[in-house]
Swiss-Prot record:
One of its GO terms (molecular function) is ATP binding. The keyword Nucleotide-binding applies. Residues 602-639 are annotated as: Disordered. The gene is dnaK. The modification Phosphothreonine is found at residue 199. Keywords: ATP-binding, Chaperone, Nucleotide-binding, Phosphoprotein, Stress response. It comes from Pseudoalteromonas atlantica (strain T6c / ATCC BAA-1087). It holds the Pfam family HSP70. Residues 602-613 have a biased composition (Low complexity). This is Chaperone protein DnaK. Induction: By stress conditions e.g. heat shock. InterPro entries: ATPase_NBD (IPR043129), Chaperone_DnaK (IPR012725), Heat_shock_70_CS (IPR018181), HSP70_C_sf (IPR029048), HSP70_peptide-bd_sf (IPR029047), Hsp_70_fam (IPR013126).
Length: 639
Protein backbone atom coordinates (compact mmCIF):
# COMPACT_ATOMS: atom_id res chain seq x y z
CA UNK A 1 0.00 0.00 0.00
CA UNK A 2 1.28 3.49 -0.88
CA UNK A 3 1.67 6.33 1.58
CA UNK A 4 -1.49 7.71 3.18
CA UNK A 5 -1.05 11.42 3.83
CA UNK A 6 -2.84 13.40 6.53
CA UNK A 7 -4.59 16.63 5.51
CA UNK A 8 -6.05 19.28 7.79
CA UNK A 9 -8.47 21.01 5.41
CA UNK A 10 -8.97 24.24 7.34
CA UNK A 11 -11.27 27.22 6.89
CA UNK A 12 -8.39 29.71 6.88
CA UNK A 13 -5.28 27.55 6.47
CA UNK A 14 -4.58 23.95 5.48
CA UNK A 15 -1.69 21.67 6.39
CA UNK A 16 -0.36 18.32 5.17
CA UNK A 17 1.74 15.75 7.02
CA UNK A 18 3.08 12.28 6.36
CA UNK A 19 4.50 9.51 8.49
CA UNK A 20 8.29 9.60 8.15
CA UNK A 21 9.62 6.56 9.97
CA UNK A 22 7.92 6.55 13.36
CA UNK A 23 7.24 10.30 13.43
CA UNK A 24 4.74 12.38 11.49
CA UNK A 25 6.34 15.21 9.52
CA UNK A 26 4.60 18.41 8.45
CA UNK A 27 5.57 19.16 4.84
CA UNK A 28 6.51 22.63 3.61
CA UNK A 29 4.77 23.83 0.45
CA UNK A 30 6.43 25.27 -2.67
CA UNK A 31 6.51 28.71 -1.01
CA UNK A 32 8.43 27.28 1.97
CA UNK A 33 5.52 27.54 4.42
CA UNK A 34 4.24 24.78 6.71
CA UNK A 35 0.62 25.91 6.31
CA UNK A 36 -1.18 27.03 3.14
CA UNK A 37 -3.95 29.66 3.05
CA UNK A 38 -7.24 27.96 2.04
CA UNK A 39 -7.73 30.57 -0.67
CA UNK A 40 -8.47 29.92 -4.35
CA UNK A 41 -8.42 32.55 -7.08
CA UNK A 42 -9.26 32.51 -10.78
CA UNK A 43 -7.09 34.99 -12.67
CA UNK A 44 -7.98 36.88 -15.85
CA UNK A 45 -5.75 34.65 -18.00
CA UNK A 46 -7.51 31.49 -16.81
CA UNK A 47 -4.97 30.36 -14.23
CA UNK A 48 -6.18 28.86 -10.94
CA UNK A 49 -4.13 30.13 -8.00
CA UNK A 50 -4.08 28.42 -4.61
CA UNK A 51 -2.63 29.53 -1.29
CA UNK A 52 -0.27 32.47 -0.92
CA UNK A 53 -0.31 33.42 -4.66
CA UNK A 54 -4.13 33.64 -4.45
CA UNK A 55 -3.98 35.67 -1.24
CA UNK A 56 -1.50 38.16 -2.75
CA UNK A 57 -3.84 39.16 -5.58
CA UNK A 58 -7.08 39.14 -3.54
CA UNK A 59 -7.30 42.94 -3.26
CA UNK A 60 -7.38 43.47 -7.02
CA UNK A 61 -9.61 40.47 -7.77
CA UNK A 62 -12.19 40.26 -4.93
CA UNK A 63 -15.04 38.68 -6.92
CA UNK A 64 -12.93 35.74 -8.10
CA UNK A 65 -10.92 35.15 -4.92
CA UNK A 66 -12.66 32.56 -2.76
CA UNK A 67 -11.91 31.96 0.92
CA UNK A 68 -13.56 30.31 3.96
CA UNK A 69 -15.37 27.90 1.59
CA UNK A 70 -15.45 25.34 4.40
CA UNK A 71 -18.23 27.46 5.95
CA UNK A 72 -20.41 26.61 2.92
CA UNK A 73 -19.51 22.96 2.38
CA UNK A 74 -22.51 20.64 2.74
CA UNK A 75 -24.85 23.55 3.51
CA UNK A 76 -28.20 24.62 2.07
CA UNK A 77 -28.53 28.11 0.61
CA UNK A 78 -31.42 28.84 2.99
CA UNK A 79 -29.38 27.99 6.12
CA UNK A 80 -29.21 31.02 8.41
CA UNK A 81 -25.41 30.67 8.62
CA UNK A 82 -25.16 30.95 4.82
CA UNK A 83 -27.50 33.95 4.72
CA UNK A 84 -25.27 35.64 7.29
CA UNK A 85 -22.18 35.07 5.13
CA UNK A 86 -23.83 36.42 1.97
CA UNK A 87 -23.76 39.93 3.45
CA UNK A 88 -20.07 39.86 4.36
CA UNK A 89 -18.34 37.86 1.61
CA UNK A 90 -16.99 39.87 -1.36
CA UNK A 91 -17.72 36.98 -3.76
CA UNK A 92 -21.20 35.84 -4.83
CA UNK A 93 -22.89 33.00 -2.93
CA UNK A 94 -25.77 31.61 -4.99
CA UNK A 95 -28.51 28.99 -4.76
CA UNK A 96 -27.76 25.86 -6.78
CA UNK A 97 -30.46 23.94 -8.62
CA UNK A 98 -30.47 21.36 -5.80
CA UNK A 99 -30.87 24.05 -3.12
CA UNK A 100 -27.26 23.94 -1.90
CA UNK A 101 -25.09 27.01 -1.32
CA UNK A 102 -22.70 27.37 -4.27
CA UNK A 103 -20.41 30.16 -5.46
CA UNK A 104 -20.44 32.19 -8.67
CA UNK A 105 -16.95 32.97 -9.96
CA UNK A 106 -15.31 33.34 -13.38
CA UNK A 107 -18.84 33.24 -14.87
CA UNK A 108 -19.32 29.70 -13.57
CA UNK A 109 -21.37 28.11 -10.81
CA UNK A 110 -19.03 26.21 -8.52
CA UNK A 111 -19.87 23.70 -5.78
CA UNK A 112 -17.94 24.08 -2.49
CA UNK A 113 -16.44 20.54 -2.77
CA UNK A 114 -15.16 21.47 -6.23
CA UNK A 115 -13.45 24.59 -4.81
CA UNK A 116 -12.07 22.81 -1.74
CA UNK A 117 -10.64 20.17 -4.10
CA UNK A 118 -8.22 22.83 -5.41
CA UNK A 119 -6.76 23.21 -1.90
CA UNK A 120 -6.57 19.42 -1.52
CA UNK A 121 -4.77 19.19 -4.89
CA UNK A 122 -2.19 21.68 -3.61
CA UNK A 123 -1.73 19.54 -0.45
CA UNK A 124 -1.42 16.40 -2.61
CA UNK A 125 1.22 18.06 -4.84
CA UNK A 126 3.12 19.33 -1.77
CA UNK A 127 3.32 15.77 -0.43
CA UNK A 128 4.28 14.32 -3.84
CA UNK A 129 7.12 16.85 -4.27
CA UNK A 130 8.50 15.87 -0.86
CA UNK A 131 8.07 12.10 -1.22
CA UNK A 132 9.06 11.90 -4.88
CA UNK A 133 6.16 9.57 -5.64
CA UNK A 134 2.49 9.78 -6.56
CA UNK A 135 0.06 10.09 -3.67
CA UNK A 136 -3.45 8.67 -4.11
CA UNK A 137 -4.75 8.18 -0.55
CA UNK A 138 -5.42 10.51 2.36
CA UNK A 139 -6.98 10.90 5.78
CA UNK A 140 -8.84 14.23 5.84
CA UNK A 141 -9.97 15.96 9.01
CA UNK A 142 -13.30 17.68 9.67
CA UNK A 143 -14.72 19.53 12.69
CA UNK A 144 -16.13 17.05 15.21
CA UNK A 145 -19.48 18.80 14.99
CA UNK A 146 -19.76 18.46 11.20
CA UNK A 147 -23.03 16.78 10.24
CA UNK A 148 -23.48 13.95 7.74
CA UNK A 149 -23.89 16.25 4.71
CA UNK A 150 -20.71 18.18 5.52
CA UNK A 151 -18.70 14.96 5.96
CA UNK A 152 -19.99 13.55 2.67
CA UNK A 153 -19.19 16.83 0.87
CA UNK A 154 -15.64 16.70 2.27
CA UNK A 155 -15.22 13.15 0.93
CA UNK A 156 -16.50 14.38 -2.45
CA UNK A 157 -13.85 17.13 -2.42
CA UNK A 158 -11.15 14.51 -1.86
CA UNK A 159 -12.44 12.40 -4.72
CA UNK A 160 -12.52 15.41 -7.07
CA UNK A 161 -8.89 16.13 -6.09
CA UNK A 162 -7.89 12.62 -7.18
CA UNK A 163 -7.59 11.21 -3.65
CA UNK A 164 -9.08 8.09 -2.17
CA UNK A 165 -10.27 9.30 1.23
CA UNK A 166 -9.35 6.38 3.48
CA UNK A 167 -10.89 7.98 6.54
CA UNK A 168 -12.62 11.15 7.68
CA UNK A 169 -11.34 11.92 11.19
CA UNK A 170 -12.50 14.57 13.65
CA UNK A 171 -10.07 17.44 14.17
CA UNK A 172 -9.95 17.33 18.00
CA UNK A 173 -9.44 13.55 17.89
CA UNK A 174 -6.55 14.01 15.45
CA UNK A 175 -4.98 16.62 17.76
CA UNK A 176 -5.30 14.24 20.72
CA UNK A 177 -3.66 11.53 18.63
CA UNK A 178 -0.71 13.86 17.91
CA UNK A 179 -0.41 14.73 21.60
CA UNK A 180 -1.11 11.28 23.04
CA UNK A 181 1.37 9.31 20.93
CA UNK A 182 4.19 11.07 22.79
CA UNK A 183 2.83 9.91 26.14
CA UNK A 184 4.76 6.82 27.13
CA UNK A 185 2.67 5.53 30.00
CA UNK A 186 -0.39 6.07 32.13
CA UNK A 187 -3.96 7.13 31.50
CA UNK A 188 -5.31 10.65 31.15
CA UNK A 189 -8.44 12.56 30.21
CA UNK A 190 -7.83 15.51 27.90
CA UNK A 191 -10.06 18.33 26.72
CA UNK A 192 -9.31 19.45 23.17
CA UNK A 193 -10.49 23.04 22.66
CA UNK A 194 -10.40 23.65 18.90
CA UNK A 195 -11.15 27.20 17.73
CA UNK A 196 -10.14 27.50 14.09
CA UNK A 197 -10.88 29.86 11.24
CA UNK A 198 -14.53 28.93 10.85
CA UNK A 199 -15.50 26.27 13.37
CA UNK A 200 -15.37 25.52 17.09
CA UNK A 201 -15.19 22.06 18.68
CA UNK A 202 -14.67 20.71 22.15
CA UNK A 203 -13.93 17.02 22.64
CA UNK A 204 -13.34 15.15 25.88
CA UNK A 205 -11.00 12.24 25.13
CA UNK A 206 -9.69 9.48 27.36
CA UNK A 207 -6.21 8.25 26.47
CA UNK A 208 -5.26 4.86 27.91
CA UNK A 209 -1.75 3.47 27.60
CA UNK A 210 -0.88 -0.04 28.66
CA UNK A 211 2.06 -2.17 27.53
CA UNK A 212 2.73 0.18 24.63
CA UNK A 213 -0.85 0.08 23.35
CA UNK A 214 -2.69 3.40 23.06
CA UNK A 215 -6.47 3.66 23.13
CA UNK A 216 -8.06 7.00 22.29
CA UNK A 217 -11.72 7.03 23.28
CA UNK A 218 -13.84 10.10 22.63
CA UNK A 219 -16.22 10.43 25.58
CA UNK A 220 -18.18 13.44 24.30
CA UNK A 221 -18.03 16.19 21.71
CA UNK A 222 -19.83 19.48 21.14
CA UNK A 223 -19.36 22.69 19.23
CA UNK A 224 -20.49 25.22 16.64
CA UNK A 225 -19.68 24.73 12.95
CA UNK A 226 -20.08 28.44 12.24
CA UNK A 227 -17.92 30.14 14.86
CA UNK A 228 -14.25 30.90 14.36
CA UNK A 229 -11.52 33.35 13.44
CA UNK A 230 -13.40 34.57 10.36
CA UNK A 231 -16.18 35.80 12.68
CA UNK A 232 -13.60 37.56 14.86
CA UNK A 233 -12.18 39.21 11.71
CA UNK A 234 -15.66 40.34 10.70
CA UNK A 235 -16.17 42.05 14.05
CA UNK A 236 -12.95 44.00 13.49
CA UNK A 237 -13.94 44.86 9.91
CA UNK A 238 -17.38 46.08 11.01
CA UNK A 239 -15.78 48.29 13.66
CA UNK A 240 -13.35 49.80 11.12
CA UNK A 241 -16.19 50.38 8.62
CA UNK A 242 -18.32 52.14 11.24
CA UNK A 243 -15.43 54.30 12.48
CA UNK A 244 -14.60 55.35 8.92
CA UNK A 245 -18.27 56.08 8.26
CA UNK A 246 -18.40 58.35 11.33
CA UNK A 247 -15.41 60.34 10.07
CA UNK A 248 -16.18 60.49 6.34
CA UNK A 249 -19.88 59.67 5.97
CA UNK A 250 -18.92 56.97 3.43
CA UNK A 251 -19.94 53.31 3.69
CA UNK A 252 -17.09 51.06 2.53
CA UNK A 253 -19.39 48.00 2.41
CA UNK A 254 -20.45 49.07 -1.08
CA UNK A 255 -16.87 48.82 -2.37
CA UNK A 256 -15.66 45.17 -2.75
CA UNK A 257 -12.06 46.26 -3.36
CA UNK A 258 -12.00 48.39 -0.20
CA UNK A 259 -13.59 45.55 1.79
CA UNK A 260 -10.91 43.13 0.61
CA UNK A 261 -8.21 45.56 1.79
CA UNK A 262 -10.03 45.91 5.10
CA UNK A 263 -10.24 42.13 5.53
CA UNK A 264 -6.49 41.78 5.10
CA UNK A 265 -5.76 44.70 7.43
CA UNK A 266 -8.30 43.54 10.03
CA UNK A 267 -6.85 40.02 10.17
CA UNK A 268 -3.31 41.45 10.45
CA UNK A 269 -4.36 43.80 13.28
CA UNK A 270 -6.05 40.95 15.17
CA UNK A 271 -2.90 38.81 14.95
CA UNK A 272 -0.63 41.70 16.02
CA UNK A 273 -2.78 42.35 19.10
CA UNK A 274 -2.03 38.85 20.41
CA UNK A 275 1.46 40.14 21.27
CA UNK A 276 1.02 43.96 21.29
CA UNK A 277 -1.31 46.22 23.30
CA UNK A 278 -2.03 48.57 20.39
CA UNK A 279 -1.74 48.68 16.60
CA UNK A 280 -2.68 51.06 13.82
CA UNK A 281 -4.71 50.18 10.75
CA UNK A 282 -3.41 52.44 8.01
CA UNK A 283 -4.98 52.17 4.53
CA UNK A 284 -4.19 55.12 2.26
CA UNK A 285 -6.48 55.77 -0.73
CA UNK A 286 -9.11 53.37 0.64
CA UNK A 287 -11.76 55.16 -1.45
CA UNK A 288 -12.55 58.54 -3.01
CA UNK A 289 -15.37 61.03 -3.48
CA UNK A 290 -15.81 64.32 -5.34
CA UNK A 291 -13.43 66.06 -2.94
CA UNK A 292 -10.63 63.58 -3.64
CA UNK A 293 -9.06 60.43 -2.18
CA UNK A 294 -9.84 59.24 1.36
CA UNK A 295 -7.43 57.54 3.74
CA UNK A 296 -8.25 55.25 6.66
CA UNK A 297 -6.11 55.54 9.80
CA UNK A 298 -7.56 54.00 12.95
CA UNK A 299 -5.82 52.97 16.17
CA UNK A 300 -6.99 49.65 17.62
CA UNK A 301 -6.13 48.52 21.15
CA UNK A 302 -6.18 45.00 22.52
CA UNK A 303 -8.86 46.10 25.00
CA UNK A 304 -11.08 47.31 22.15
CA UNK A 305 -10.56 44.10 20.17
CA UNK A 306 -11.45 42.04 23.22
CA UNK A 307 -14.63 44.04 23.77
CA UNK A 308 -15.61 43.34 20.13
CA UNK A 309 -15.14 39.55 20.35
CA UNK A 310 -15.74 38.74 24.02
CA UNK A 311 -19.32 37.64 23.38
CA UNK A 312 -18.09 35.03 20.87
CA UNK A 313 -15.37 33.73 23.21
CA UNK A 314 -17.99 33.38 25.96
CA UNK A 315 -20.21 31.48 23.50
CA UNK A 316 -17.62 28.67 23.45
CA UNK A 317 -18.12 27.98 27.17
CA UNK A 318 -21.63 26.53 26.87
CA UNK A 319 -20.47 23.65 24.61
CA UNK A 320 -17.67 23.00 27.15
CA UNK A 321 -20.22 22.56 29.94
CA UNK A 322 -22.42 20.35 27.75
CA UNK A 323 -19.50 18.13 26.68
CA UNK A 324 -18.44 17.60 30.30
CA UNK A 325 -22.04 16.79 31.28
CA UNK A 326 -22.38 14.31 28.38
CA UNK A 327 -19.11 12.64 29.44
CA UNK A 328 -20.37 12.55 33.04
CA UNK A 329 -17.23 14.36 34.21
CA UNK A 330 -16.40 17.49 36.17
CA UNK A 331 -13.70 20.08 35.47
CA UNK A 332 -11.48 18.43 38.09
CA UNK A 333 -11.43 15.17 36.09
CA UNK A 334 -9.59 16.82 33.19
CA UNK A 335 -5.82 16.19 33.29
CA UNK A 336 -4.73 18.27 30.31
CA UNK A 337 -6.16 20.93 28.02
CA UNK A 338 -4.96 21.07 24.42
CA UNK A 339 -5.54 24.22 22.37
CA UNK A 340 -5.94 23.74 18.61
CA UNK A 341 -6.58 26.28 15.85
CA UNK A 342 -4.87 29.61 15.19
CA UNK A 343 -7.54 31.61 17.03
CA UNK A 344 -6.48 30.01 20.35
CA UNK A 345 -3.36 32.20 20.25
CA UNK A 346 -5.55 35.12 21.33
CA UNK A 347 -4.81 35.93 25.01
CA UNK A 348 -8.53 36.43 25.76
CA UNK A 349 -9.33 32.90 24.55
CA UNK A 350 -6.53 31.44 26.68
CA UNK A 351 -7.76 33.46 29.70
CA UNK A 352 -11.32 32.13 29.45
CA UNK A 353 -10.15 28.53 28.93
CA UNK A 354 -7.76 28.77 31.89
CA UNK A 355 -10.49 30.21 34.14
CA UNK A 356 -13.01 27.56 33.07
CA UNK A 357 -10.75 24.56 33.71
CA UNK A 358 -8.80 26.11 36.60
CA UNK A 359 -5.48 25.25 34.99
CA UNK A 360 -3.21 26.43 32.18
CA UNK A 361 -3.54 24.75 28.77
CA UNK A 362 -0.50 22.87 27.47
CA UNK A 363 1.99 24.91 25.47
CA UNK A 364 3.79 22.01 23.77
CA UNK A 365 1.18 21.35 21.07
CA UNK A 366 1.42 23.39 17.86
CA UNK A 367 -2.14 24.66 17.28
CA UNK A 368 -1.63 24.99 13.51
CA UNK A 369 -0.03 21.58 12.88
CA UNK A 370 -1.36 19.12 15.48
CA UNK A 371 -4.45 18.17 13.45
CA UNK A 372 -2.49 17.31 10.28
CA UNK A 373 0.05 15.36 12.38
CA UNK A 374 -2.78 13.34 13.94
CA UNK A 375 -4.28 12.68 10.51
CA UNK A 376 -0.90 11.38 9.29
CA UNK A 377 -0.68 9.07 12.33
CA UNK A 378 -4.17 7.75 11.52
CA UNK A 379 -2.94 7.22 7.95
CA UNK A 380 -0.11 5.15 9.41
CA UNK A 381 -2.60 3.11 11.45
CA UNK A 382 -4.68 2.37 8.34
CA UNK A 383 -1.63 1.40 6.25
CA UNK A 384 -0.30 -0.85 9.03
CA UNK A 385 2.81 1.27 9.69
CA UNK A 386 1.57 2.27 13.15
CA UNK A 387 0.66 -0.58 15.46
CA UNK A 388 -1.04 -0.73 18.86
CA UNK A 389 -3.33 2.28 18.37
CA UNK A 390 -7.10 2.05 18.74
CA UNK A 391 -9.23 5.09 17.95
CA UNK A 392 -12.81 5.17 19.25
CA UNK A 393 -14.62 8.24 17.94
CA UNK A 394 -18.26 9.26 18.33
CA UNK A 395 -21.14 10.62 16.29
CA UNK A 396 -21.68 14.26 17.32
CA UNK A 397 -25.46 14.43 16.88
CA UNK A 398 -28.39 12.05 17.36
CA UNK A 399 -29.73 10.25 14.28
CA UNK A 400 -33.29 9.06 13.79
CA UNK A 401 -36.43 9.12 11.66
CA UNK A 402 -39.64 11.12 11.60
CA UNK A 403 -42.54 9.20 13.12
CA UNK A 404 -46.26 9.88 13.47
CA UNK A 405 -47.15 13.37 14.64
CA UNK A 406 -43.94 14.96 13.32
CA UNK A 407 -41.79 13.52 16.12
CA UNK A 408 -38.11 12.60 15.73
CA UNK A 409 -37.44 9.11 17.08
CA UNK A 410 -33.70 8.64 17.64
CA UNK A 411 -32.12 5.31 16.71
CA UNK A 412 -28.56 6.40 17.51
CA UNK A 413 -28.01 8.87 20.33
CA UNK A 414 -25.30 11.57 20.15
CA UNK A 415 -21.82 10.62 21.45
CA UNK A 416 -22.33 6.97 20.46
CA UNK A 417 -19.00 5.32 19.55
CA UNK A 418 -18.64 4.68 15.81
CA UNK A 419 -18.75 2.52 13.78
CA UNK A 420 -22.13 1.37 15.09
CA UNK A 421 -25.34 -0.28 13.91
CA UNK A 422 -28.82 -0.01 15.45
CA UNK A 423 -32.21 -1.41 14.37
CA UNK A 424 -35.75 -0.63 15.48
CA UNK A 425 -39.13 -1.93 14.30
CA UNK A 426 -41.86 0.48 13.21
CA UNK A 427 -45.29 0.02 11.63
CA UNK A 428 -47.87 1.72 9.42
CA UNK A 429 -50.01 4.68 10.49
CA UNK A 430 -53.08 3.83 8.34
CA UNK A 431 -55.10 0.77 7.30
CA UNK A 432 -54.02 -0.90 4.03
CA UNK A 433 -50.96 1.34 3.72
CA UNK A 434 -48.85 -0.02 0.85
CA UNK A 435 -45.76 2.17 1.28
CA UNK A 436 -43.88 4.03 4.02
CA UNK A 437 -41.59 7.03 3.70
CA UNK A 438 -38.44 6.88 5.81
CA UNK A 439 -37.37 10.48 6.57
CA UNK A 440 -33.87 10.50 8.10
CA UNK A 441 -33.00 13.29 10.56
CA UNK A 442 -29.97 14.50 12.52
CA UNK A 443 -30.18 16.69 15.62
CA UNK A 444 -31.36 16.95 19.20
CA UNK A 445 -34.90 18.40 18.82
CA UNK A 446 -37.95 16.24 19.54
CA UNK A 447 -39.84 18.12 16.84
CA UNK A 448 -38.78 16.61 13.50
CA UNK A 449 -38.94 19.96 11.68
CA UNK A 450 -36.35 21.40 14.08
CA UNK A 451 -33.66 18.95 12.98
CA UNK A 452 -31.43 18.63 9.92
CA UNK A 453 -33.06 16.57 7.15
CA UNK A 454 -30.50 14.14 5.73
CA UNK A 455 -32.73 12.56 3.12
CA UNK A 456 -35.70 10.28 2.61
CA UNK A 457 -36.74 7.20 0.64
CA UNK A 458 -39.81 5.00 0.18
CA UNK A 459 -40.31 1.33 1.03
CA UNK A 460 -43.09 0.08 -1.26
CA UNK A 461 -45.02 -3.16 -1.75
CA UNK A 462 -46.24 -3.58 1.82
CA UNK A 463 -49.14 -6.10 1.99
CA UNK A 464 -52.53 -4.53 2.84
CA UNK A 465 -53.23 -4.86 6.57
CA UNK A 466 -54.64 -2.98 9.51
CA UNK A 467 -52.55 -0.08 10.81
CA UNK A 468 -49.92 -1.26 13.25
CA UNK A 469 -49.81 -4.81 11.85
CA UNK A 470 -46.91 -4.64 9.33
CA UNK A 471 -43.42 -4.93 10.83
CA UNK A 472 -40.96 -2.48 9.24
CA UNK A 473 -37.39 -2.86 10.53
CA UNK A 474 -35.30 0.30 10.09
CA UNK A 475 -31.52 -0.09 10.47
CA UNK A 476 -29.00 2.74 10.89
CA UNK A 477 -25.37 1.84 10.18
CA UNK A 478 -22.65 4.48 10.73
CA UNK A 479 -19.23 3.74 9.26
CA UNK A 480 -15.85 4.83 10.65
CA UNK A 481 -16.06 8.10 8.70
CA UNK A 482 -19.26 8.95 10.55
CA UNK A 483 -21.29 8.58 7.34
CA UNK A 484 -24.72 7.00 7.62
CA UNK A 485 -26.23 4.07 5.71
CA UNK A 486 -29.96 3.40 6.22
CA UNK A 487 -32.11 0.41 5.29
CA UNK A 488 -35.81 -0.41 5.75
CA UNK A 489 -37.10 -3.97 5.53
CA UNK A 490 -40.66 -5.34 5.53
CA UNK A 491 -40.36 -8.43 7.77
CA UNK A 492 -43.43 -10.01 6.14
CA UNK A 493 -42.31 -9.82 2.50
CA UNK A 494 -38.55 -9.40 3.11
CA UNK A 495 -38.60 -6.46 0.69
CA UNK A 496 -35.75 -4.10 1.50
CA UNK A 497 -34.67 -0.61 0.48
CA UNK A 498 -31.18 0.74 1.25
CA UNK A 499 -29.51 4.11 0.80
CA UNK A 500 -26.29 5.81 1.77
CA UNK A 501 -27.33 9.16 3.13
CA UNK A 502 -25.74 11.95 1.15
CA UNK A 503 -27.75 15.02 1.99
CA UNK A 504 -31.23 16.17 1.17
CA UNK A 505 -29.41 17.56 -1.85
CA UNK A 506 -25.62 17.24 -2.12
CA UNK A 507 -23.71 16.19 -5.22
CA UNK A 508 -24.82 13.11 -7.12
CA UNK A 509 -22.23 10.47 -8.10
CA UNK A 510 -22.49 11.68 -11.71
CA UNK A 511 -21.79 15.28 -10.67
CA UNK A 512 -18.78 14.23 -8.60
CA UNK A 513 -17.49 12.07 -11.47
CA UNK A 514 -17.84 14.99 -13.89
CA UNK A 515 -15.87 17.21 -11.49
CA UNK A 516 -13.19 14.51 -11.19
CA UNK A 517 -12.90 14.46 -15.01
CA UNK A 518 -12.86 18.28 -15.15
CA UNK A 519 -10.06 18.30 -12.57
CA UNK A 520 -8.08 15.81 -14.68
CA UNK A 521 -8.65 17.94 -17.78
CA UNK A 522 -7.55 21.03 -15.87
CA UNK A 523 -4.45 19.17 -14.69
CA UNK A 524 -3.39 18.85 -18.32
CA UNK A 525 -4.37 22.47 -19.00
CA UNK A 526 -2.35 23.60 -15.96
CA UNK A 527 0.66 21.64 -17.22
CA UNK A 528 0.35 23.23 -20.66
CA UNK A 529 -0.01 26.68 -19.06
CA UNK A 530 3.18 26.09 -17.03
CA UNK A 531 5.09 24.91 -20.12
CA UNK A 532 3.83 27.96 -22.02
CA UNK A 533 5.06 30.32 -19.30
CA UNK A 534 8.48 28.61 -19.29
CA UNK A 535 8.74 28.87 -23.09
CA UNK A 536 7.73 32.55 -22.99
CA UNK A 537 10.21 33.34 -20.19
CA UNK A 538 13.03 31.57 -22.01
CA UNK A 539 12.19 33.48 -25.21
CA UNK A 540 12.07 36.86 -23.43
CA UNK A 541 15.43 36.17 -21.78
CA UNK A 542 16.99 35.12 -25.10
CA UNK A 543 15.64 38.20 -26.93
CA UNK A 544 17.01 40.56 -24.27
CA UNK A 545 20.39 38.77 -24.08
CA UNK A 546 20.84 38.58 -27.87
CA UNK A 547 20.16 42.29 -28.47
CA UNK A 548 22.59 43.19 -25.68
CA UNK A 549 25.32 40.96 -27.21
CA UNK A 550 24.75 42.44 -30.70
CA UNK A 551 25.24 45.91 -29.22
CA UNK A 552 28.43 44.85 -27.39
CA UNK A 553 29.82 43.13 -30.52
CA UNK A 554 29.73 46.43 -32.44
CA UNK A 555 31.68 46.42 -35.72
CA UNK A 556 33.04 42.92 -35.05
CA UNK A 557 29.71 41.65 -36.40
CA UNK A 558 28.94 42.22 -40.09
CA UNK A 559 25.80 44.11 -41.13
CA UNK A 560 24.59 40.96 -42.84
CA UNK A 561 24.91 38.92 -39.61
CA UNK A 562 23.22 41.70 -37.61
CA UNK A 563 20.27 41.74 -40.03
CA UNK A 564 19.91 37.95 -39.89
CA UNK A 565 19.94 37.94 -36.07
CA UNK A 566 17.48 40.87 -35.84
CA UNK A 567 15.10 39.08 -38.22
CA UNK A 568 15.21 35.98 -35.98
CA UNK A 569 14.62 38.17 -32.88
CA UNK A 570 11.58 39.85 -34.49
CA UNK A 571 10.19 36.45 -35.56
CA UNK A 572 10.50 35.20 -31.97
CA UNK A 573 8.82 38.36 -30.62
CA UNK A 574 5.89 37.78 -32.98
CA UNK A 575 5.62 34.14 -31.86
CA UNK A 576 5.54 35.24 -28.19
CA UNK A 577 2.74 37.71 -28.98
CA UNK A 578 0.75 35.00 -30.78
CA UNK A 579 1.05 32.73 -27.73
CA UNK A 580 1.63 29.41 -29.53
CA UNK A 581 4.05 27.25 -27.53
CA UNK A 582 5.29 25.18 -30.48
CA UNK A 583 5.94 28.33 -32.54
CA UNK A 584 7.80 29.97 -29.63
CA UNK A 585 10.00 26.89 -29.16
CA UNK A 586 10.66 26.66 -32.92
CA UNK A 587 11.58 30.37 -33.27
CA UNK A 588 13.72 30.13 -30.11
CA UNK A 589 15.82 27.41 -31.76
CA UNK A 590 16.08 29.48 -34.96
CA UNK A 591 17.36 32.47 -32.97
CA UNK A 592 19.90 30.28 -31.15
CA UNK A 593 21.20 29.05 -34.54
CA UNK A 594 21.22 32.56 -36.00
CA UNK A 595 23.19 33.77 -32.97
CA UNK A 596 26.01 31.24 -33.47
CA UNK A 597 28.11 33.97 -35.12
CA UNK A 598 27.64 36.08 -31.98
CA UNK A 599 29.25 33.36 -29.85
CA UNK A 600 32.26 33.22 -32.20
CA UNK A 601 32.71 37.00 -31.95
CA UNK A 602 32.34 36.96 -28.15
CA UNK A 603 34.92 34.16 -27.79
CA UNK A 604 37.36 35.94 -30.12
CA UNK A 605 37.01 39.18 -28.12
CA UNK A 606 37.62 37.33 -24.84
CA UNK A 607 40.70 35.58 -26.23
CA UNK A 608 42.11 38.90 -27.48
CA UNK A 609 41.47 40.58 -24.14
CA UNK A 610 43.18 37.70 -22.32
CA UNK A 611 46.28 37.86 -24.51
CA UNK A 612 46.68 41.63 -24.01
CA UNK A 613 46.42 41.34 -20.21
CA UNK A 614 49.05 38.52 -19.80
CA UNK A 615 52.57 39.77 -18.68
CA UNK A 616 55.63 38.28 -20.42
CA UNK A 617 57.08 36.68 -17.25
CA UNK A 618 53.72 35.41 -16.06
CA UNK A 619 54.79 31.79 -16.04
CA UNK A 620 57.89 32.55 -13.99
CA UNK A 621 55.85 34.66 -11.59
CA UNK A 622 53.37 31.80 -11.15
CA UNK A 623 56.22 29.39 -10.29
CA UNK A 624 57.60 31.85 -7.72
CA UNK A 625 54.21 32.03 -6.03
CA UNK A 626 53.90 28.28 -5.54
CA UNK A 627 54.00 27.31 -1.83
CA UNK A 628 54.44 23.75 -0.64
CA UNK A 629 51.92 22.93 2.08
CA UNK A 630 50.68 19.97 4.00
CA UNK A 631 46.98 19.39 3.70
CA UNK A 632 44.37 17.23 5.34
CA UNK A 633 41.24 15.97 3.60
CA UNK A 634 38.11 16.92 5.53
CA UNK A 635 35.06 14.75 4.93
CA UNK A 636 31.70 16.39 5.38
CA UNK A 637 29.38 13.78 6.88
CA UNK A 638 26.40 16.03 6.36
CA UNK A 639 26.51 15.80 2.59
Amino acid sequence: MGRIIGIDLGTTNSCVAVLDGEKAKVIENAEGDRTTPSIIAYSQDGETLVGQPAKRQAITNPKNTLFAIKRLIGRRFEDKEVQRDIDIMPFDIIKADNGDAWVQAKDEKLAPPQISAEVLKKMKKTAEDYLGEEVTAAVITVPAYFNDSQRQATKDAGRIAGLEVKRIINEPTAAALAYGMDKKKGDSVVAVYDLGGGTFDISIIEIDEADGEHTFEVLATNGDTHLGGEDFDNQVINYLVEEFKKDSGMDLRKDPLAMQRLKEAGEKAKIELSSAQQTEVNLPYITADASGPKHLTIKLTRAKLESLVEKMVKATLEPLKQALADADLSVGDINDIILVGGQTRMPLVQKYVTEFFGKEPRKDVNPDEAVAVGAAIQGGVLSGDVKDVLLLDVTPLSLGIETMGGVMTALIEKNTTVPTKKSQTFSTAEDNQSAVTVHVLQGERKQAAGNKSLGQFNLEGIRPAQRGAPQIEVTFDIDADGILHVSAKDKDTNKEQKITIKASSGLSDDEVEKMVQDAEANKEADKQFEEMVQARNQADGLIHGTRKQVEEAGDALSDEDKAEIEAAVVALEEAVKAGEKEAIESKTQELIQASAKLMEVAQAQQAAAGAEGQPEDASAKQDDDVVDAEFEEVKDDKK
